[in-house]
Amino acid sequence: MADDATRKAVSDIPLLKTNSGPRDKELWVQRLREEYLALIKYVENNKVADNDWFRLESNKEGTRWFGKCWYIHDLMKYEFDVEFDIPVTYPTTAPEVAIPELDGKTAKMYRGGKICLTDHFKPLWARNVPKFGLAHLMALGLGPWLAVEIPDLISKGIVVHKEQQNN
């Protein structure tokens, strides 16, 4: 399914141990600590590999996440807001990542700008509960989705670089 670079990136992300979601207040704090450590490691590895492509932060409870993701195409940076909520059944249920400004612009997206991860990512997530976390969601979910969809949307003229919008 994944190319060698993706396999390498994912193998360098720490696996999570705590099987807890937001309903379990005490264990959720431990799970969040693991999530942050894995995300930090993934971002650090991406920076070393000159592949830095997102920033995330969460609300105080760790149940709502938001930030920016970007994709470089023909040496131009396309930046998008990204957001998702942690489902109450997390980690059994993967979060649904949304890029609101792309809502309705591709068939591989649900209402509200939620990207389609059903065919490839969700079965992989299900096989790896509770070891996979948000860093894995980014590496195996959003990253590949951006790599396929953004160049296609650019080639169709649906996504236009901000410098070209004013022309």
Curated annotation (Swiss-Prot):
Keywords for this protein: Ubl conjugation pathway
Superkingdom per UniProt: Eukaryota
Active site: C116 (glycyl thioester intermediate)
Entry GO terms, CC: cytoplasm
Glycoprotein is among the record's keywords: no
Molecular function via GO: UFM1 conjugating enzyme activity
The keyword Aminoacyl-tRNA synthetase appears for this protein: no
An annotated GO BP: protein ufmylation
SUPFAM superfamilies: UBC-like (SSF54495)
Pfam families linked to this entry: UFC1 (PF08694)
InterPro entries in alphabetical order: UBQ-conjugating_enzyme/RWD, Ufc1
Self-association state and partner proteins as the record states: Interacts with UBA5 (via C-terminus). Interacts with UFL1. Interacts with UFM1.
Assigned protein family: Belongs to the ubiquitin-conjugating enzyme family. UFC1 subfamily.
Role description: E2-like enzyme which specifically catalyzes the second step in ufmylation. Accepts the ubiquitin-like modifier UFM1 from the E1 enzyme UBA5 and forms an intermediate with UFM1 via a thioester linkage. Ufmylation is involved in various processes, such as ribosome recycling, response to DNA damage, interferon response or reticulophagy (also called ER-phagy).
Entry protein name: Ubiquitin-fold modifier-conjugating enzyme 1
Organism: Osmerus mordax (Rainbow smelt)
Phylogenetic classification of the source organism: Eukaryota, Metazoa, Chordata, Craniata, Vertebrata
